[in-house]
């Protein structure tokens, strides 16, 4: 028999959460409801509230119920991409093994075990790199991109 073709959905929680945190960081003096944040992320307010709840539990963000003024709980240069990843994904690995291979096939049963060590190495390296990237680094890069875009528009 053949395995059915499945469309694998990848998680965008990390990039969506970084988006939320950058919005909060650069709009500290403005009102930011979950609806306005959701509009920017192009998702629904319920999803934004779920992400924000995870950020609060991880002590990366604070907010008061009924007030649309969320804030970072510490400076952006003290929040790493790994902190954000762990807040929204927990211990979920970046790469996943296919556990639905044919157990009667020598390759099917052994390829996953062969990959596991490599996946663990990749996870470790990715987490080490993520721990060196701060939210402030991302904000700075965002502002650089905006500056370049504005300069290009002025040339045209």
Language-model segment annotations:
Residues 76-101:
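Conserved segment of winged-helix/HTH DNA-binding domains
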Residues 25-29, 74-75:
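Short helix-capping/hinge SLiMs at alpha-helix to coil transitions
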Residues 35-41:
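A short alpha-helical element within helix-turn-helix/winged-helix DNA-binding domains
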């Amino acid at each position: 028999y053949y395995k059915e073709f499945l469309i694998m959905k990848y998680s965008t929680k990390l990039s969506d959460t970084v988006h939320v945190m950058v919005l909060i960081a650069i709009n500290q003096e403005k009102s930011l409801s979950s609806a306005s944040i959701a509009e920017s992320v192009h998702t629904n307010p319920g999803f934004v509230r779920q992400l924000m709840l995870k950020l609060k539990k991880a002590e990366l963000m604070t907010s008061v119920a009924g007030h649309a003024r969320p804030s970072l709980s510490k400076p952006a240069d003290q929040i790493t991409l790994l902190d954000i990843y762990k807040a929204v994904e927990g211990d979920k690995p970046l790469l996943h093994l296919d556990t639905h291979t044919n157990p009667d096939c020598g390759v099917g049963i052994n390829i996953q075990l062969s990959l596991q060590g490599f996946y663990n190495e990749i996870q470790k390296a990715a987490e080490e790199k993520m721990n060196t990237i701060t939210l402030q680094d991302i904000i700075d890069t965002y502002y650089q991109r905006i500056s370049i875009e504005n300069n290009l528009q002025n040339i045209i």
